[in-house]
Amino acid sequence: MKFVLLFGVLLVTLFSYSSAEMLDDFDQAVEDELLSLIEKEEARAKECTPRFYDCSHDRHSCCRSELFKDVCTCFYPEGGDNEVCTCQQPKHLKYMEKAADKAKKFGGKIKKWFG
């Protein structure tokens, strides 16, 4: 009986060790694949255009604000014939960000009072 028990423990130990090795190999392969994808993404990334800067060269290059991406807005200045494009935040998104910020601050106060 002792021999069967000892053999069973040895078998379980070897099985768990081999399955752990297989999982490590699998995790390493997944990690390598993910790193290669991230490197490709970083190489593709480009600089964004800050708010109120010229975005006529690439109208989709505006930076993100805290919650929303700025929009490239084009207009003709008064008395001018040239079109000017700048990255701006639409007013409704500006108000939504302010409301979200106030709600976050109010939630912090509530948590402080009752937490």
Curated annotation (Swiss-Prot):
Top-rank lineage group of the source organism: Eukaryota
Proregion span(s): 21-44
InterPro entries: Spider_toxin_CSTX_knottin, Spider_toxin_CSTX_Knottin_CS
Keyword Electron transport among UniProt keywords: no
Subcellular location: Secreted
Database matches in PROSITE patterns: SPIDER_CSTX
Alphabetical UniProt keywords: Disulfide bond, Knottin, Secreted, Signal, Toxin
Chief location bin: secreted
One GO MF term: toxin activity
Name of a matching Pfam family: Toxin_35
Signal peptide: 1-20
One of the record's GO cellular component terms: extracellular region
Cysteine pairings via disulfide bonds: C48-C63, C55-C72, C62-C87, C74-C85
Expression sites by tissue: Expressed by the venom gland.
UniProt remark on domains: The presence of a 'disulfide through disulfide knot' structurally defines this protein as a knottin.
Family: Belongs to the neurotoxin 19 (CSTX) family. 01 subfamily.
Record-given protein name: U3-lycotoxin-Ls1a
Origin species: Lycosa singoriensis
Lineage: Eukaryota, Metazoa, Ecdysozoa, Arthropoda, Chelicerata
